[in-house]
Amino acid sequence: MHFARVVKSIHSVYSLPMCDTQIVVDTEKIRKAIELQLPIAITTYTLPRDMDIYIGQVAKTILDLIGQPHVKDYLTYCISELTTNAKKANTKRIYFREKGLDIFDPQDYKRGMKSFKEESLENINHYLKLQQQEGLYVKVTMQVLSHALVIEVINNCKMTPMEFKRVFDKRVRARRYSGLEEALAHILDNSEGAGLGLVIMMLMLKKLGLEEDVYRLVVEEDRTISRMVVPRNIEIQTQTTKLAASIADRIDDIPQLPSKLLEIQRAIENPDVQLSDIVALISQDVALVTDLLKLVNSARFGMNKRCLDISEAVKRVGLRGLQNLLYSVGAGRVLQSTDDERKQLWNQAYRTGYFALGLAKATGDQALIADSYICGLLHNLGEVVFTSAYPEMLIKLTEIQAERNIPPHVLDTIMSDVGHAEIGAALAQRWNLPEPVINTIRFHHNLPHAPEEYKPLISTVAFANMTIRFLDGETPYEQIPRSLLSFFRIQSEQQLRTTAQTLQSSFEAEQTA
């Protein structure tokens, strides 16, 4: 049997006619979401044919932009299969309710499934209308991370044990088949139309050379998630990291941190140094003294009496706080500019640092509080560097690409925020910045791959950045990962807006103090 006919036979019965108005894919918004590694979310209640096509077009656009067009047909089929199953699961809830059956009761489930397919198809518009009225949705999210494309299909119904078992059985059966023809000859399930489609999906993933564990089924109390984590080309990841390191090595016009600050840094790291020695070194740098006193007298320290003594100021901020101040001042001096774009980037960096500190304080975690500001401040170091060296850096990029025969889409990755993170991390290593700072720069767009010990810190900076984008109208609430909202106990859009506005007001007050 031809593959296209198989797909049509499975899906056409649950598709509504295409609407007259076609939904247009916004390529630039998708490109920006990829750069920021934000999830692209699409929600539908009835999954009409035009929406199914639109979801497929969004997926194809993403795959084109990340240089993997060869998997488009396979993955769009998988997404279509999972969304159809999710919609069908919602329909099933309405059908069972109308029949007075308990879908979680094994006997009722068996009884209802005998007639579900035929009767629901005869009156599908009725059931879809009720689904929408009751708020039963299908949500598709697609998120491009540095290592993978994460696709989730979510419906807000808890899967029953019987449904879970049937899906598991189909997965086990799919392992027995070497191809589609063999599967078609053995699997025909009249009650569960999703069975054959799931087997086809598993065989398609196998054909792509993927392990079956790229597909996961997650059952929560109020929703069911079908998740696919499709690896990006490993070679591309390696090339991106190497290219970023090469760029950092070739930035000749970016000097090391100022020698006086490095001298103070070495003194702090010396276990035999006296506090008076550190104070003496700081006293030789008027600008550093100014920044130190400004810091210790700022609202974040909450002191009732102003401090004007350098020795007392060092005691109050502590050696760790002093180190972070050195990195902040040093980076600012090296990369300072009157250029509007770079000034804007630094202003955004200061804002992110302040928001990260505010979020950290809410957790009460002292280690998190100590590192959050400096990591928030320097998280976009790569973007600042890239802007400062452009267009010279673009010339160097092109030279390196030609020398190493690197594909064009790897260069596109470097030009994106993801590439900026690699460049920033490489530069931070050149400056011998501490590991928390280096890891925050490298992974703030790639939380799943962040080292476990730094995840709370990196999550704080990433959430601070997203909170600012949300407040500025650049990132919708729906695009903020649920894991981050949960970590900071944000339960609604209004709660996030209130938090963001409070942090913004405090930030503005400190700027004018």
UniProtKB/Swiss-Prot annotation:
It comes from Treponema pallidum (strain Nichols). Residues 254-447 form the HDOD domain. This is Uncharacterized protein TP_0073. PROSITE patterns: HDOD (PS51833). Pfam families: HDOD (PF08668).
